[in-house]
From Swiss-Prot:
Alphabetized GO MF terms: 5-oxoprolinase (ATP-hydrolyzing) activity; ATP binding
Gene of this entry: pxpA
Name of the protein in its database record: 5-oxoprolinase subunit A
Protein source organism: Bacillus cereus (strain B4264)
Chain's role: Catalyzes the cleavage of 5-oxoproline to form L-glutamate coupled to the hydrolysis of ATP to ADP and inorganic phosphate.
Keywords: ATP-binding, Hydrolase, Nucleotide-binding
Gene3D superfamilies: Glycoside hydrolase/deacetylase
Disulfide bridge positions per record: none
Keyword Lipoprotein set for record: no
C-alpha cells in the first residue's frame, strides 16, 4: 500500500485574532507545522495547538519563520545565514519546550513562507536551517520543497532526513518552484483542480506547471495551508480520495 503524509500549517492565530481551521482540520491530517511566534502564533496558541494535536495522534513539527508578524513571514528579508540559524534554533527550542511539557515528542521542522522559499534556492539559507536542526536534535526530520538541491545538499551534509514536500493548493513554475504569491495564479482555489494535482503528484510522480509542462516530483508529504480559503474542504476531500484509492495517510518515520 502506498503511504503519504498530509501536513498542515497550524497554530497561526495570535491573541484575539483567529486564523485557520485548526480544530476542524486535525482529524484529516497526519502531521502539523506549528507557528513559533515569529511570523504568527503566541505561547498560548502554541501550547493549545500541541495539546490538541496530541489528542488526535498527529505528528508535531516546528514551523519557524522570519520575525515579521505584519507580513505573516511571507516577505523576503535581507538576513545573513548566521541570523537564520539563530532564528530557527530559537523557534525550535521554544516549541520543543511546550511539546516536552505536554509529554510529546517533536517530529519535524518545516520552514515557513519566505524563509522556506529562500532556502529552496539558496544553499546558505538551507544550510543554516539544517545546521540548527542538527545542533538541537538531529533526529528531527526536515520538510522541504521536493527536488530542491539546496535542501537535499543541506540534509546530506548534516545527516538529517529530508522529507520532500509538494503542495495541494499552490501552482508550480516549470523549474519546480512555487509560483510567487504576488502572481494571480499562485493559489489553487478549485477543489477538483487541487485533487487532480495531488493525485498526479502522488500516483504519477509529476505536477503540471503553469505553462503546461510536466515537472517530475517525488512527494513524500503533501501540504495544505491552514489559512487557505478552502483548506477544510480540501483536507476532507483529499483524505477521502486517498482512502478510496487505497493510499495510507501516515506521518513519515
Amino acid at each position: 500500500m502506498k503511504t503519504i503524509d498530509l501536513n498542515c500549517d497550524s497554530g497561526e492565530s495570535f491573541g484575539a485574532y483567529k486564523m485557520g481551521n485548526d480544530d476542524e482540520i486535525l482529524p484529516f491530517v497526519s502531521s502539523i507545522n506549528v507557528a513559533c511566534g515569529f511570523h504568527a502564533g503566541d505561547p498560548s496558541v502554541m501550547r493549545q495547538t500541541i495539546e490538541k494535536a496530541m489528542q488526535h495522534n498527529v505528528a508535531i513539527g516546528a514551523h519557524p519563520g522570519f520575525p515579521d508578524l505584519i507580513g505573516f513571514g511571507r516577505r523576503n528579508m535581507n538576513v545573513s545565514a548566521s541570523e537564520v540559524y539563530d532564528y530557527v534554533l530559537y523557534q525550535i527550542g521554544a516549541l520543543d519546550g511546550f511539546v516536552k511539557v505536554a509529554g510529546g515528542k517533536m517530529h519535524h521542522v518545516k520552514p515557513h513562507g519566505a524563509l522556506y522559499n529562500m532556502a529552496a534556492t539558496n544553499p546558505e539559507i538551507a544550510d543554516a536551517i539544517a545546521k540548527a536542526i542538527y545542533h538541537i536534535n538531529p533526529s528531527l526530520l526536515l520538510y522541504g520543497l521536493a527536488n530542491s538541491e539546496a535542501f537535499i545538499q543541506a540534509a546530506v551534509k548534516y545527516n538529517i532526513t529530508l522529507v520532500q514536500e509538494a503542495f495541494a493548493d499552490r501552482t508550480y513554475k516549470q523549474d519546480g518552484t512555487l509560483t510567487s504569491r504576488t502572481e494571480e495564479n499562485a493559489l489553487i482555489k478549485n477543489e477538483e483542480e487541487a485533487i487532480k494535482q495531488v493525485l498526479q503528484m502522488v500516483k504519477e510522480g509529476y505536477v503540471s506547471a503553469v505553462n503546461g509542462e510536466k515537472v517530475a516530483v517525488q512527494a513524500q508529504t503533501i501540504c495544505l495551508h491552514g489559512d487557505g480559503e478552502k483548506a477544510l474542504q480540501f483536507a476532507k476531500r483529499i483524505y477521502r480520495t486517498f482512502e478510496h484509492d487505497g493510499i495510507s495517510i501516515c506521518a513519515p518515520k
